[in-house]
């Protein structure tokens, strides 16, 4: 299985864990022009972001897209961040947190060479004691 297929498989497993953990419905639907992974209570839109902690080539990071972030922020949507370790064909979740899109710190967006060149940012699970995605935000 190539790296891209493994990433898709692990991402799907992370989505399933997030849906069970937060009692969300996975629907991969379009919401105000962007794709979201799940709906929480009251139809609130969430996107699941997964990062592999045991990557060989680089450190783990979550990739956020500006167009999606803007929609989630305006609609009081959120993210579920899942930090996992790949174990065989499965995953072991190390940390999982849901967070309102509005509660993320100010983001400096860049243009990446992925997904049509849209503005994006890659955020490590821990960017310092005071700005950790996995510890210090207002969780839902």
Give the residues covered by each predicted segment:
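Nucleic-acid endonuclease domains
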Residues: 1-140
